[in-house]
Structure formats: C-alpha cells, structure tokens
C-alpha cells in the first residue's frame, strides 16, 4: 500500500536523514518492533527505557510511510468531540481520554528536551473555530464540557479572534495545550538515539509470514531470513488492517499543501494550531522555517493509488477555504501532497493484543490521536 504521494513536504525538506542495513541473517531478539514511523520510534524508545532488548524493522526506509505525510500537529483532541464521545463511552471515560491527550503532549515535550531531539518541537495553543453561526451554537456546549473537566480552555468571540489572529470565524475554543513538530525528523532522531544505546534497526526488510511457536513467535522475511522474538509489537498503523480480520478502522485520503517561506503573515499565527468545524474539517499551522501549512479535504479511500489530478484539485480547494478563513494571508503554494489515514468509530486508538496472533501486540493510532500511543508500553 502506498501511503503518500511522492511530494511529501517533510521528506523533501529533510531528505534521507539516517539509513540502516536490511536484514541479511537470522536473529533473535527480546522485543521486535515492526514499523519505523513515529509510533514505532516512540514505542521502541519506551521499551529501551524499560530495559528491553529491542530490534526495529521496516519494509521501507525509516519514516517513509504515513509519518512523512502527516501535518505533525499535536493536539489533545481526538476526532470525536468530547460531548459526542461522552455519549458513547460515558462522560468520565471520555474526559479521561482527553486528559491523557494533554499528558501525552507534556510527556513528548519532556522527551524532546531530555533526549535533545532536533525536530522543531514547539508548544502552542490550539484554536478550534466555528465556520458559521449554526456551528458556533453546536461548538459552545463542547467548550462547556471541556471547561467542566478543566482542560484549559477559553471561549473566544469572533471579533477577538479576528483582531488577534486575522481569522474570520463565528467564535471558537482556545486550548492552552498543543504543539507542533516535524514528526518525520523526530522519528529519525529518536531511532538514531536508541541505536547509540544498543537498539538494532533494519530497514528495507519486509515480513511475509508470522509463525506461532507457542511461547515465541517467529517472523520470516521476504529474503527468507528469520527473527525469533519473545514479543512482537506492530506499529504499522493503517497497514495493520491487512493483518486483522476485524475491521477496526475506515481508510480515508487526506491532503495538505504548504506555502513558500514568507514573513508576511500575522505572527500570532505562529503561536497556535487551527482547525475548524467543517466536514471535512480544515486544519492549519506554521512551520519552523516560516511557511504556512493547510490540510484536510478528506475523501473516501477507493484504491491504493493517489491520483495526481485529484491531489491538485484538493490543493486548490484547500487554498480557497484557507483564503476565506485568513483573507489577509499571502499564500503562495509551494508543495502539495496526500496520504492515506484512518478513522475509527469513536476516534480512539487500538492498543493491545489480538486473539489472531499470540505474543503479538498492536499499537495503532488512528485519526487525530497519533500522539497517544507512546503510553502503550504500559500494556507490557
């Protein structure tokens, strides 16, 4: 499955940061992490911290799946509004999910600082705006339930939003915990950090089968080499759907475009991440090299090929919506791309064991909750 178009901004910006050999012999390891994107990087780091012997493999070069296509916006919100999630799993449980999102962002901040990762990590605020009066009326109860659970929110009226940020809206929720990052670079930096302390990494290593050997599973690669592990952790995101009989997520296309470097935008925009109530929603952020990035225009997944002409149409639509939201922004398109992502019925990730695979665990973040799986090491 091809998870992005070729022109991913983060990949073009950074290039191939670190390279690793493919597996050329049979090996044994305590924990095998499959997937070298941001989730695999975070999980393997947590396992190394806990003292495990870890081997990480990926069928591509590191970070070149959906991690290189993400907009790298870290928000505690998931795709399901808190008030709606409360109806599905209960108010207390729903609030806990949101609170864990805040904790995850704070933990990522500590991780970046402690391990001195050069990945453009910046703490920000998050502005969730209503695009019309009806949306504002529906958004205000969301603000009230977030305020009830002390999630660090304020309600901003349209005039205040326009004056401070130059954004046209009908009001919105300002949250005090969010962050932006270069997830592709962070994955590379974190994996390189752990290689220095003993983790083994093999890229361009594809699995063709997993054999159940009772207490220890055995992986067979395309080159007919074997990996014996005590536990396997799948951090392969949306590609894991091919392994599971249960349909845990629905695949979608999502699109993004980034401007040329510019210094003409309202500098207050550098302090926030922006998303709105439209369906499909629009999300916006600045980058650490002075660009403006806009994404969204999600569409139903139909096949494995992201068509170039569709990507161009979506890019035009994103820019059109952006200019309605930020009419004073001088946006000159530079790079546009698309990727395949997934959504679940409640917006929550899937973390844990599957009855289909003994001694195997799955850490699958879908939709807007990709920041949370770094806590999944607790399942051990």
Regions found by a protein language model. Give the residues of each.
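Glycine-rich active-site loop/strand segments that organize a redox cofactor
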Residues: 70-100
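Glycine-rich FAD pyrophosphate-binding loop
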Residues: 49-69
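Extreme N-terminal leader/targeting segments of oxidoreductases
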Residues: 1-31
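Helical element adjacent to the flavin cofactor pocket in flavoenzyme catalytic cores
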Residues: 145, 169-230, 235
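Rossmann-like flavin
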Residues: 88-193
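Flavin-dependent oxidoreductases
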Residues: 209-287
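C-terminal catalytic lobe of FAD-dependent flavoproteins
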Residues: 302, 307-308, 323-380
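N-terminal Rossmann-like FAD-binding beta1-loop-alpha1 element of flavoenzymes
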Residues: 27-56
């Amino acid at each position: 499955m091809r998870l992005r178009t070729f022109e991913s901004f983060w990949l073009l910006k950074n290039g191939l940061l670190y390279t690793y050999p493919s597996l050329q012999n049979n090996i044994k390891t305590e924990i095998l992490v499959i997937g070298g994107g941001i989730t695999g990087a975070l999980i393997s780091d947590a396992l190394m911290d806990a003292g495990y012997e870890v081997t990480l493999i990926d069928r591509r070069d590191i970070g070149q799946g959906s991690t290189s296509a993400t907009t790298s916006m870290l928000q505690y919100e998931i795709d399901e509004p808190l008030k709606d999630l409360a109806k599905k799993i209960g108010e207390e449980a729903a609030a806990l999910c949101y609170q864990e999102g805040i904790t995850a962002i704070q933990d990522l901040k500590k991780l970046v600082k402690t391990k001195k990762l050069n990945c453009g990590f910046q703490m920000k605020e998050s502005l969730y705006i209503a695009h019309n009066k009806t949306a504002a009326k529906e958004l205000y109860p969301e603000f009230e339930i977030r305020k009830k659970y002390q999630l660090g929110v304020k309600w901003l009226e349209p005039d205040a939003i326009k004056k401070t940020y130059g954004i046209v809206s009908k009001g919105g929720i300002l949250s005090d915990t969010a962050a932006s990052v270069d997830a592709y670079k962070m994955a590379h930096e974190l994996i390189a950090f752990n290689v220095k302390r003993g983790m083994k990494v093999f890229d361009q290593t594809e699995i063709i089968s997993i054999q159940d050997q009772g207490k220890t599973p055995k992986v067979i690669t395309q080159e007919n080499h074997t990996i014996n592990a005590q536990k396997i952790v799948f951090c392969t995101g949306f590609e894991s759907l091919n392994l599971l009989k249960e349909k845990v997520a629905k695949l979608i296309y999502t699109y993004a475009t980034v401007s040329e470097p510019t210094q003409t935008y309202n500098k207050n925009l550098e302090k926030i991440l922006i998303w709105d109530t439209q369906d499909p929603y629009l999300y916006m952020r600045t980058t650490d090299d002075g660009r403006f990035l806009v994404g969204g225009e999600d569409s139903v997944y139909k096949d494995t090929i992201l068509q170039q002409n569709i990507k161009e149409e979506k890019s035009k639509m994103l820019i059109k919506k952006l200019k309605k939201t930020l009419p004073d922004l001088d946006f000159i398109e530079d790079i546009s791309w698309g990727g395949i992502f997934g959504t679940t019925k409640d917006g929550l990730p899937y973390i844990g064991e599957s009855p289909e695979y003994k001694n195997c665990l799955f850490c699958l973040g879908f939709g807007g909750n990709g920041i949370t799986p770094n806590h999944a090491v607790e399942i051990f």
